[in-house]
Amino acid sequence: MKLQKPKGTQDILPVAAAKWQYVEGVARETFKQYHYGEIRTPMFEHYEVISRSVGDTTDIVTKEMYDFYDKGDRHITLRPEGTAPVVRSYVENKLFAPEVQKPVKLYYIGSMFRYERPQAGRLREFHQIGVECFGSANPATDVETIAMAYHLFERLGIKEVTLHLNSLGNAASRAAYRQALIDYLSPMRETLSKDSQRRLDENPLRVLDSKEKEDKIAVANAPSILDYLDEESQAHFDAVRSMLEVLAIPYVIDTNMVRGLDYYNHTIFEFITEVDQSELTICAGGRYDGLVEYFGGPATPGFGFGLGLERLLLILDKQGVELPVEEGLDVYIAVLGAYANVAALALTQAIRRQGFTVERDYLGRKIKAQFKSADAFKAKVVITLGESEIKTGQAVLKHNQTRQEMTVSFDQIQTNFASIFAECIQ
């Protein structure tokens, strides 16, 4: 049997991983500017953490979860999204306590798991960057969080990003709209897909989110949820829109956008860009004011978003965005003969301890092959060590671009390499 990675997973090799690290680094720096701290939750949770929060009727729970019973007969699931585990942690660790400063701002970066058909930018194990903000019902929090995502995309160089915006209102608004949608769709039930016929009974708003052609036709003239917002919900949405305009963040209203998770209320949003003449969602999120209470905590407003790293990197690649990655080695040490092996080891370590990236030959190859390795690694400086260098206590440093050389003592290299390096590459 040929051993291979499971379907829908990937090996992220060093060249690609450098791009991942760059994107993750920009995200961390951006979130830090907005005073977010990192949280790391388990990759698996009790099944109820996900099923109760995400919604029993969602595709995630009914079709896509990796769940199993462990040896203690506990129902466990690999996390399919990041918000529910973070909310569970917020409640379990009592981050709602009065001594904890509010709002509590958290971000996460990690693997998620969904059993779905693998395709470009979508895998069964995928990686998500997400943020959650707890404790503020202020519409300014909605806008700040949306602006943070927009800021991140600007820093990464993503082109032509469009913000799609909608409001699901509060519980009363959603109840009124739910009934209006049932009244509108019921006469055309037989024309809906089988999934949407089921959704019409369980959660009719999800019909709006369907990708099936027949469902899109059915909802084309459906009533708008914005017509059913009560005074409180309308005021919140109006405030969000006006503050987005203050920050000069353009948006379009998308009344058919409901998001695929059941816990949202009030503001929901997606950032969409065009790739190969197709629209791709980069990031999505919204407000979830009832979720903390649902997990057994006090009533606590929340707002957040998630974005898929694989899709983000795909979009950057398709749009031709060049990510700055590792520039190569500072130093490559060419080793001539076994006599120089120990000295090369000591010198390599001494230079690394002064903050430089260094590689050396371990394979006993001919000098020409070692110089080719130095070129392949894009080494700035090459140091050649052989028997004569060790006997004299001096090494030859060569600028790998200009080929200019300088001779320096081992003592100088071991104690003041920064000055020597700067002189060599100037």
Curated annotation (Swiss-Prot):
Cellular localization per UniProt: Cytoplasm
GO annotation, cellular component aspect: cytoplasm
Alphabetized GO MF terms: ATP binding; catalytic activity, acting on a protein; histidine-tRNA ligase activity; transferase activity
Broad enzyme group: ligase
Enzyme Commission numbers on file: 6.1.1.21
One GO BP: histidyl-tRNA aminoacylation
InterPro entries hit by this protein: aa-tRNA-synth_II, aa-tRNA-synth_II/BPL/LPL, Anticodon-bd, Anticodon-bd_dom_sf, His-tRNA-ligase, HisRS-like_core, HisRS/HisZ, HisRS_anticodon
UniProt catalytic activity: tRNA(His) + L-histidine + ATP = L-histidyl-tRNA(His) + AMP + diphosphate + H(+)
UniProtKB keywords: Aminoacyl-tRNA synthetase, ATP-binding, Cytoplasm, Ligase, Nucleotide-binding, Protein biosynthesis
Sequence intervals crossing the membrane: none
Phosphoprotein in keyword set: no
Subunit (UniProt): Homodimer.
Family designation: Belongs to the class-II aminoacyl-tRNA synthetase family.
PANTHER family for the chain: HISTIDINE--TRNA LIGASE, MITOCHONDRIAL-RELATED (PTHR43707:SF1), HISTIDYL-TRNA SYNTHETASE (PTHR43707)
NCBIfam families linked to this entry: hisS
The protein's name in its UniProt record: Histidine--tRNA ligase
Source organism of this protein record: Streptococcus equi subsp. equi (strain 4047)
Gene that encodes the chain: hisS
